[in-house]
Amino acid sequence: MKKLIMVLMALLVCAVAFAALDFTEVDALYLTDEHDQEVYDKLTVMLEQATEGEEKANVLWRLSRVCVDLGDAIDKSDKKARFAIYEEGEQYALDSIAAYPTAQGYLWKCSNIGRWGQTKGVFDSLAKAKPMVQDLEVMIDDLGCLDSSEAWYVLAVLYDSLPGKPISFGNSNAAISYGRIACDTIPRNVIYGGTYKQLAEMLWNRNWNAKKRASEISKMQKNWDKETSNIEKYKYYEGANGAQAYPLWTKTALSSMTDRQEAVVILKYAQAVFEGRKTHTQADVDNYNEIAALLKEWT
C-alpha cells in the first residue's frame, strides 16, 4: 500500500511537471495595459517552466510583445533605455521563432524593430525596413495569417513613414490599403483607436476628391484581382470591392465622398467605439483624446 501511494505521488509530480502552461491570467493582465512589468515578471518565471518547442515559443513571443509596451512607457528622451528594451524584445521574438515558428513570433519581432526604428529615426533605420517586410511576408503569405490587425498596422505605418522610390519603398496608397484591412480586422475585445486614427490621418494627407477616388479605386480593383501574393494583393485592398463599396464606418460609398470627409467619419466612428465600451485602458483614453483634438482641428 505504501509503495502504491509513493508511485501515485510520483505520477502526480510528473503530471504537474509536464502540465501545459496556462496563459489565461497573463494574457488578461496584459490587455489591461496597466501591469506590463508584472506581466514581464510572470513570463520570465514561465519561461523557466516551459518545455522546449511550441510552449517555449509561446512564452517568448509574449515576452517580446510586452517589451513593446515597456519600451513605449519609457520617456522618449531616454533613447538608450528604449533601444535596449526593443532589442531585448526582438531577441525574444528571434528565440521564439527558433523554438517554433509562429505568426506571433514574426509579428512581435517586427513590432520591436519598428519601434526601434521610430526611436532612431526613419533615415537612420532604412536598412531594417526590407527585412521587416520579409518577416511579415512569412507571416501573411507562408503562415496564412490574414486576420492580424497588428500586422497590417505595422505595414501601414511602415509604408506611410518610409520615403518613396528611389530611396525606399514608401507608398501612401499601399499604406492606406494596409490601414483599411488593419481597421477591418480589429478584434472585438479591444478598441485600437490608434489604428483608426492612423488611417484617418493618412486619408487626410492624401486628400483625393470624390472623382479621383472613384477613378483610382477602380484601378486598384484590377490590381487586387490580378495579384496572387497576399502581401502584394493587400496593397490594393482599398479597391477590393470596387469604388461603390461601403466601408465599415459609413453607408456612403467610397466613390461618393472625399478622402477628408471619410477621415472625419472614421474618427467619429472610433469615438463611438470608445464610448460604447465600459472599460478602457490608458492607451484607449490617450487615443480618444488625440482623436477629439484632431476632430476639433479638422471640423
Map each language-model feature to its residues.
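Positively charged n-region of N-terminal signal peptides that target proteins for export
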Residues: M1-L4
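Bacterial N-terminal signal peptides
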Residues: V7-A15
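Amphipathic alpha-helical repeat scaffolds of TPR domains
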Residues: A20-L31, G53-K76, Y100-K120, C145-P163, ...
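Helix-turn-helix repeat elements of alpha-solenoid scaffolds
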Residues: Y30-M46, D78-L94, S125-D135, F169-Y178, ...
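Alpha-helical junction/boundary sensor with strong preference for TPR arrays
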Residues: L47-A50, E54, C67, I74, ...
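TPR/TPR-like (Sel1-like) alpha-helical repeat modules
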Residues: A127-E137, G170-C183, I217-E232, T252-K278
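A contiguous pocket-lining binding segment that forms or flanks enzyme active sites
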Residues: D135-D142, E150-L155, S161-I167, N171-G194
